Amino acid sequence: MQFHEHPHEHPHHHEHVLDRRSALRLGGLGLGGLLLAACAPSKSAISSTSTELSASTTTAATVDVASTIASSTSAAASQATTSSTAAATVLNTLPGFDEFASTVKVFASGDYWQVESNGLPAHNMMVGITSWQQQVPLPMTYKGSNAWQLPKQPALADNPVSAKTSLYRGAIALAVNGVPIFNALNNRGEDAFLVGELDKWGGHCGRADDYHYHVAPLHLATIVGSAKPIAYALDGFAIYGSTEPDGSTMKKLDAYNGHIGTDGVYHYHGTTTYPYINGGMRGVIRGVVGDQVDPQPSAKPFREAGAPLQGATITNFSSPKTGQYALEYSQSGKTGLVEYTVSDTAVAFTFTSPTGAVTTEKYTR
């Protein structure tokens, strides 16, 4: 099924992703004790610690992932790839992100790629959520000192960090459309997708009204193709879709949802079963602070966290114009509405409950 992206920040209103929830329920997932990264950890959660992982503790030489992917991508398109073409790709961007160049900016800075975005996808959002915390998608300021950072030369770690025992908060990967990807399970050890907390694209909003995925955005493969990644883990290694970069059947994966490719470089895959995305950090990272990969951008809440709205199902989300949004939901056979306008400094809400009661709220950001 064809999936479209448009170079503007507001989503269009067509649904193009098949609902995998019914199929996944048949799979029987082994659920661990992860916390949903978008939610506050429970009291039983592992206390915040700081674990520094040295870049010298590696089991493989560092590799230039951009150069390797660029070579593979060019080879798939033409047998006449030149080294100068690959070098130009390395200097300009990371493969995959180039398909979203109008809304996602990538540039080299020292040993890292800096990635800037507003965190909102071009596809629609929120539709299909049946377990809703009353948070809504807002554009974020992932830029400048708050941009995403991906190592230019990732390396395998002697001591990988498993998402089953840590990384309970924050992102563990970044999709090539600029949307962060969080861990998969909520603070009750439940699969967030299977229990209805995610929309048809595998995302929802966190406490800061920040939209993010909790499963692999496999739908992006229809845009970038099999030869390019759909995301990158925060350790710098690429995440491909459900096939190998050459289009062949996906090979056996390790506990982190990855393996060494035919090019000799490690990469992850997105899957339709847990862990869906990278199952942790197989590569070297600078540290884990407060149960999240550090450093990474912050998304700070500007209002009190929402509470679960029992019996509500989100039925529609739209953006009639830039900076204006509307979310519709059904509850007990009636329709509720959240309309809001966003500027650089403020957010104004109008809430219409299923009973018809109207309230307004305004916040500074």
Model segments located where?
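Short, low-complexity, disordered segments immediately C-terminal to signal peptides
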Residues: 40-69
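Solvent-exposed N-terminal domain segments of exported/luminal and surface proteins
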Residues: 65, 69, 76-188
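Extracellular/lumenal glycan-associated surfaces
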Residues: 177, 207-220, 263-274
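Extracellular glycan/ECM-engagement signal in secreted proteins
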Residues: 86-138, 224-357
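N-terminal secretory signal peptides
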Residues: 1-22, 27-38, 46
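Active-site cradle of extracellular carbohydrate-active enzymes
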Residues: 199, 203, 208-240
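A mature extracytoplasmic/lumenal domain signature
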Residues: 154, 185-187, 215-219, 243-245, ...
